[in-house]
From Swiss-Prot:
Function: Forms part of the ribosomal stalk which helps the ribosome interact with GTP-bound translation factors.
Family affiliation: Belongs to the universal ribosomal protein uL11 family.
InterPro entries, alphabetized: Ribosomal_uL11 (IPR000911), Ribosomal_uL11_bac-typ (IPR006519), Ribosomal_uL11_C (IPR020783), Ribosomal_uL11_C_sf (IPR036769), Ribosomal_uL11_CS (IPR020785), Ribosomal_uL11_N (IPR020784), Ribosomal_uL11_N_sf (IPR036796)
UniProt keyword annotation of rRNA-binding present: yes
Record SUPFAM superfamilies: Ribosomal L11/L12e N-terminal domain, Ribosomal protein L11, C-terminal domain
SMART domains on file: RL11
Gene3D superfamilies membership: Ribosomal protein L11, C-terminal domain, Ribosomal protein L11/L12, N-terminal domain
Protein name: Large ribosomal subunit protein uL11
Species, as recorded: Serratia proteamaculans (strain 568)
Amino acid sequence: MAKKVQAYVKLQVAAGMANPSPPVGPALGQQGVNIMEFCKAFNAKTDSVEKGLPIPVVITVYSDRSFTFVTKTPPAAVLLKKAAGIKSGSGKPNKDKVGKVTSAQVREIAETKAADMTGSNVEAMTRSIEGTARSMGLVVED
């Protein structure tokens, strides 16, 4: 018989840097999950990813206090900031432009995020990432 799901916990945790401090500890502690077990498993799974990159994770907690988790790709905004070499987006994206990204970089980000995005093809996903870039105050060059 399948285990009964108690809760879903969604977090963004820095790759390879999960530890029992907030936000991980309190979120999982409320569900009665072994926090260190999650931290070790998460850090092992995100070993191949650049350390410190925020990774969205969905943790499924079962009624017997066991858990499974699924990691996703980093948010598009984080990947765009990294590609443009900036710390943060523009406060006024329509007036102040803070950086530039090329179409090739945007396409590469779209291909990276393809597994997590809803879209029929890479072109549609590329347009979506371009929209995110524009809303951050980045200029997309051909």
